[in-house]
């Protein structure tokens, strides 16, 4: 053994080796998605969105994005809800998104963003926490509210970014869709810039994200996104 050969601290090498492996795995898990995105090593397809939770809101949202050639997939463990998404001709995954089967069978490299939008706020936060390291902490979003919490301080530890500012609950979004709220895609031009867009929108319009000419998606609630510009397509 190394100890028998007189190597100093030989007994500690096993512990050092274990610690090195553990740190390597941890860093790999938390940086793989963001690093691949930064180095442009992800799938050559356009950036897509993984929705967790099939509902009138997510189905309408996904249909509008699909019309803009944004890859979308809705995952849900409820057959009745997922069937509605299938009838809307959307790609679906039937099963528990937090299961081992989902991690093995879903090609997550297709998705640069995720929206957790079930009727369970705690579950939405759990999903975002689980997928954050792989997709990117700043690119996992959720609906709902977490009472008694400083949301900003929790963004990079528990849960996801709020999809809306201020946050909206599942019930609020469902009622909006039932009342006729729908998604629109508006392309900005030199003549019709963001200022004119904002001035002509009806009260209650929410800008959720915009699609860059490159296909990249920027979410309005993300700090540092700025404002959409010429050539961008706003989803509101």
What is the predicted role of each segment?
Residues 1-236:
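Cytosolic regulatory regions of ion transport systems
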């Amino acid at each position: 053994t190394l100890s028998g050969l007189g190597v100093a601290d030989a007994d500690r090498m096993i512990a050092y080796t274990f610690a090195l492996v553990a740190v390597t795995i941890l860093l790999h898990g938390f940086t793989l998605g963001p690093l691949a995105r930064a180095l442009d090593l992800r799938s050559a397809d356009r950036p897509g969105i993984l929705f967790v939770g099939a509902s009138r809101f997510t189905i309408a949202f996904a249909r509008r994005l699909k019309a803009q050639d944004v890859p979308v997939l809705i995952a849900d463990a409820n057959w009745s809800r997922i069937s509605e998404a299938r009838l809307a001709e959307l790609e679906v995954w039937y099963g528990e998104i937090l299961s081992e089967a989902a991690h093995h069978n879903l090609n997550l490299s297709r998705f640069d963003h995720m929206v957790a939008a079930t009727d369970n706020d705690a579950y939405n936060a759990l999903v975002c926490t689980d997928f954050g390291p792989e997709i990117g902490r700043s690119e996992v979003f959720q609906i709902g509210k977490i009472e008694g919490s400083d949301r900003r301080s929790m963004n990079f530890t528990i849960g996801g970014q709020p999809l809306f500012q201020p946050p909206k609950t599942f019930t609020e979004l469902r009622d909006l869709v039932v009342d006729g709220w729908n998604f629109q895609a508006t392309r900005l031009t030199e003549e019709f810039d963001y200022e004119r867009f904002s001035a002509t929108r009806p009260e209650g319009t929410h800008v959720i994200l915009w699609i860059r000419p490159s296909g990249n998606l920027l979410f309005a609630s993300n700090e540092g996104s700025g404002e959409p510009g010429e050539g961008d397509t706003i989803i509101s």
